[in-house]
């Protein structure tokens, strides 16, 4: 579901889709170009121009699309978030890539996800690719957005004495609103 995707990121996605289809006979590949939808969305909301808002809107448009495809196929939406992203630092878009029905790898650190990929025979090109959400026009990757590598985040999450622990806590604090239950107003009877 490319939305104004950087060519190298899109090409890598196509490589992975091709590998999946060849390896697993039950995989269907659907290329859904989302540029027109996003362009219309951006034009309607042009007076509310905000780069970060548009990046998150891309994730939310993808989520809505995934739920439509799932509904049409009597299916569910499967998440791709890992423990560092989902529970460590909240590195996902609320109601975007965080909007899923099940999250099978959410208890795995990123290093475990890479290890699992190798075990399953996933191409090293894909495993070694710089992680990115693909939501930014400039092609920024996860490390650039987070300011830390996944290896450093994992170490900091597991060890309060790690030199990056405070930085990890700062990132986490900024995103707790995504990981905590939605605040509600309660009334006494």
Task: Give the ranges of each region predicted by the language model.
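A generic local structural motif
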Residues: 63-65
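ATP-dependent adenylation/pyrophosphate-handling site
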Residues: 1-17
């Amino acid at each position: 579901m490319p939305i104004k995707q950087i060519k190298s990121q899109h090409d890598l996605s196509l490589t992975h889709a091709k590998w999946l289809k060849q390896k697993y006979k039950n995989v269907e590949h659907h290329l859904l170009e989302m540029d027109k939808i996003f362009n219309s969305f951006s034009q309607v909301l042009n007076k509310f121009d905000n780069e970060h808002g548009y990046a998150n809107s891309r994730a939310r448009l993808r989520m809505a699309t995934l739920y439509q495809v799932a509904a049409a196929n009597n299916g569910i939406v499967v998440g791709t978030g890992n423990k560092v992203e989902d529970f460590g630092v909240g590195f996902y878009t609320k109601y975007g890539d965080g909007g899923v029905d099940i999250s099978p790898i959410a208890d795995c650190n990123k290093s475990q996800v890479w290890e699992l990929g190798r075990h399953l025979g996933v191409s090293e090109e894909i495993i070694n690719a710089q992680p990115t959400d693909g939501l930014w026009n400039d092609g920024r990757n996860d490390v650039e957005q987070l300011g830390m590598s996944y290896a450093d985040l994992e170490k900091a999450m597991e060890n309060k004495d790690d030199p990056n622990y405070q930085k990890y806590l700062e990132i986490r604090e900024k995103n707790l609103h995504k990981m905590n239950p939605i605040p509600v107003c309660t009334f006494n009877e």
